[in-house]
């Protein structure tokens, strides 16, 4: 197994690891994710029926209403939140949801902003391990050698 690393901007501190789940389009957690199961339920989303639980969730940006923060926090409360969230564009709704989940439920889901040129390489990894502290996030990519 080979390991590489990518640096990113930390938006929410924490550490998490999981297989990457790359979403081709932004996802609204309010109405697009079942917080009880972690299932993507948006019937128009290309990754409908994917499970976010325990995954390194990669999405270009969030989409939707401010209620998405509550839906994301609820998924963490019920134990089906992602292990980490990687974005290309800043999204305050995603950040607030992860911060609320950390404060209320002790969920340490890091959220990081990655550079678009790193996106494909991250998505192709077998597993991603994210550690976010301060403003710096380090993402270790594990791939089969």
Which residue stretches match the model-derived regions?
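Short, low-complexity, intrinsically disordered N-terminal peptides in bacterial proteins
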Residues: 1-7, 142-145
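Internal active-site segments that recognize and position negatively charged phosphoryl groups
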Residues: 17
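Phosphate/diphosphate-binding glycine-rich loops and adjacent basic-rich segments that engage nucleotide
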Residues: 133-145
């Amino acid at each position: 197994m080979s390991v590489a690393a990518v640096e990113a901007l930390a938006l929410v501190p924490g550490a998490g690891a999981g297989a990457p789940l790359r979403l081709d389009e932004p996802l609204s957690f309010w109405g697009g994710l079942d917080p009880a199961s972690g299932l993507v339920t948006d019937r128009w989303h290309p990754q409908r029926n994917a499970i976010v639980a325990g995954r390194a969730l990669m999405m270009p940006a969030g989409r939707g209403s401010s209620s998405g923060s509550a839906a994301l926090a609820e998924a963490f409360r019920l134990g089906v939140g992602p292990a980490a969230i990687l974005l290309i564009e800043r999204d305050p709704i995603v950040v607030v949801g992860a911060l609320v989940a950390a404060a209320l439920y002790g969920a340490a889901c890091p959220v990081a902003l990655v550079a678009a040129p790193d996106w494909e390489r991250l998505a192709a990894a077998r597993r991603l391990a994210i550690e976010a502290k301060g403003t710096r996030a380090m993402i270790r990519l594990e791939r089969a050698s």
